[in-house]
């Protein structure tokens, strides 16, 4: 199946609220736990989360790592609005900064972060090289980086099977988004080519489920 682009931003308030209300606890906590297992020495500093959505992952990082501050970046105000409420409710307004920006327009200094993470932003990007360039630019030399995203299946039929397997009980708007996201995602081979073009081929890239891949490692100098 060829890649089919979906909208870069989730701007519909109904769509964003449905996403914020959905139960991604297992996947999101697994992402944080994976980071801690891969980079056990990382315990303090500034972490940036690209495509933070409603800020569940920034909140989980702050709870897991008390000496870490998080800058969450998302291009959609509709997604950040529930995120700001969640950060306030968690009592983490002093440690979580939420910024509305579209890559490459974040405007932060090169090497300004001690760690870079992103879960499920890449498939929204029409030009993936922009994403990887920002990962390389924002993290300082040796910074841990962890990126996870969907893997594009071989056919639309397989994509529908995955949606029904993992989202059967979710609202139709989320099931539709999941299907479109699978079609917009990249294959493992495509991601490895992107990493090579960005000078990030030292990052490891592997499948971790039937629908997710991760790329991880320390950023080059």
Question: Model-found features: residue ranges?
Answer:
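N-terminal, positively charged/glycine-rich alpha-helical extensions of SAM-dependent methyltransferases
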Residues: 1-18
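Conserved alpha-helix/loop element of class I SAM-dependent methyltransferases that forms part
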Residues: 25-44
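A conserved beta-strand element that flanks and buttresses the S-adenosyl-L-methionine
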Residues: 117
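Conserved beta-strand signature within the Rossmann-like core of class I S-adenosyl-L-methionine
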Residues: 143-149
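Core SAM-dependent methyltransferase catalytic element
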Residues: 201-221
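A short glycine-rich, Lys/Arg-flanked "PGG" loop and its adjoining helix->strand segment in the class I
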Residues: 130-141
């Amino acid at each position: 199946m060829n890649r089919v682009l979906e909208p870069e931003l989730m701007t519909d308030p109904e769509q964003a609220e449905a996403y914020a209300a959905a139960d991604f606890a297992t996947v999101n906590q697994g992402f944080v736990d994976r980071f801690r297992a891969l980079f056990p020495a990382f315990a303090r500093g500034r972490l940036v989360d690209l495509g933070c959505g409603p800020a569940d992952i920034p909140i989980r990082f702050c709870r897991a790592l008390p000496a870490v501050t998080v800058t969450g970046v998302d291009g959609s105000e509709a997604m950040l609005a529930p995120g700001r409420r969640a950060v306030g409710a968690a009592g983490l307004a002093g440690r979580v900064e939420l910024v509305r920006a579209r890559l490459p327009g974040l405007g932060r200094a090169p090497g300004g972060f001690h760690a870079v993470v992103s879960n499920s932003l890449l498939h929204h990007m029409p030009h993936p090289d922009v994403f990887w360039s920002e990962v390389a630019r924002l993290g300082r030399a040796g910074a841990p980086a962890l990126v996870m995203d969907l893997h594009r299946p071989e056919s639309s039929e397989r994509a529908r099977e995955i949606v029904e397997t993992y989202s059967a009980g979710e609202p139709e708007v989320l099931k539709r988004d999941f299907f479109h996201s699978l079609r917009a995602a990249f294959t493992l081979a495509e991601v490895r080519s992107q990493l090579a073009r960005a000078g990030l081929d030292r990052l490891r890239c592997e499948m971790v489920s039937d629908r997710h891949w991760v790329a991880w490692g320390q950023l080059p100098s």
